[in-house]
Amino acid sequence: MRNSMKKWNKSKYSLVMLLLAVMLATSGCTSIVKEGTELLEEGNYTEAAEKFQESVDKGKDLGEAWRGLGICYWEEEDYEKAEKAFGNALQNGSEETATIYNMLGICALMTDKPEKAVYYFENGQEFPDAGQELLKEMSFNLIAAYEQVGDYQKAKEKMEVYLSLYPDDERALKEKEFLNTQVPSREE
């Protein structure tokens, strides 16, 4: 499961684009944050991070600047820094969203903090902005988090719910086979 987490790119792109759209729609941002957002959109993560850091250093638009830094670090796969930046974004007024919680959960998984990942995935699903695709992704990620914690029974329970909603998900069907080797079925 951990290897499959490292290889997901389609969802990663969707998450980043969603956060970028929110950042661009935010009114009242300084030109520094807007410049950083434009650089981020262009894929210039180093330059974008410099702009967001400049805004942080000046104490301007802290929530947006930290969120921008989080996305830059995320794109560079520096999950430790991304997690810290997203946390700072939330502490500085950035809106709590399902997307940020999913990204925080993935950061926690990638940095071997599965208990935190469980928290983020479970709570992130409660936000009203969580669309169907994001809920599906977070549900699957929650299973991965429980596996990493070592709670295979809970992972199996979550997998049963997941497959009742998404019965044709081949990745989940393969994962269920693995979970069945870790936890005997109830009939046994």
Where are the language model's segments positioned?
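Register position in tetratricopeptide repeats
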Residues: 41-42, 75, 110, 144, ...
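Alpha-helical segment of the N-proximal tetratricopeptide repeat
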Residues: 30-58, 75
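Short coil turns that delineate tetratricopeptide repeat
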Residues: 60, 94-95, 129, 167
